[in-house]
């Protein structure tokens, strides 16, 4: 790994830490710190670690997406970091989709109710699935271009 890549990786990590400290404070990094989300009569208690992980993955993904596109897939290290961040973002988005889908199932309250379509959470779920598909396509394309560039270099 080149020195420039190490500096970019450390700089991005420091930026993520500063942003997380400014948003969540020192208490946000403690194991017992949680965030309560109240939606109608349902409470979701989510550890702050999940929000910190989400923000960190999104920042790393966006920084290395821009670096990868700017360098035209020529830098192997940037491409690998991008693919790792893409896989982590798929993991995080899958968890968010499961939370949204569980809330879609809670909306049914009667025994013989009609199915509700086009609710806000239904649209959010579809948008998250679309983002997930776009990330998978970007990772596949990045792997393809990395393989082509790596083969040309040998």
Q: Predicted regions span which residues?
A:
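Canonical alpha-helical transmembrane segments
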Residues: 54-72
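Hydrophobic alpha-helical transmembrane segments
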Residues: 47-59, 116-138
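Alpha-helical transmembrane segments and immediately adjacent membrane-interfacial amphipathic helices
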Residues: 57-62, 91-102, 129-142
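Hydrophobic alpha-helical membrane-insertion segments
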Residues: 8-22, 80-99
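Alpha-helical transmembrane segments of multi-pass membrane proteins
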Residues: 15-30, 126
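N-terminal membrane topogenic signal
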Residues: 1-12, 146-148
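Cytosolic juxtamembrane helix at the C-terminal end of the final transmembrane segment
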Residues: 68, 136-154
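Membrane-interface interhelical loops and short amphipathic "cap" helices
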Residues: 26-48, 103-121
């Amino acid at each position: 790994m080149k020195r420039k890549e190490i500096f970019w990786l450390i700089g991005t990590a420091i930026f993520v830490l500063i942003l997380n400290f400014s948003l969540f404070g020192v208490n946000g990094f403690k194991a017992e710190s949680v965030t309560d989300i109240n939606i109608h009569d349902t409470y979701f208690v989510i550890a702050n670690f999940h929000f910190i992980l989400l923000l960190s993955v999104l920042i790393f993904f966006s920084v290395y997406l821009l670096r990868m596109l700017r360098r035209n897939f020529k830098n192997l290290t940037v491409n690998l970091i991008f693919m790792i961040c893409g896989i982590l973002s798929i993991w995080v988005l899958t968890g968010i989709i499961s939370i949204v889908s569980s809330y879609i199932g809670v909306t049914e309250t009667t025994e013989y109710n009609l199915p509700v379509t086009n609710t806000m959470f239904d649209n959010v779920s579809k948008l998250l699935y679309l983002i997930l598909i776009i990330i998978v396509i970007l990772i596949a394309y990045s792997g393809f271009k990395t393989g082509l560039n790596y083969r040309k270099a040998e």
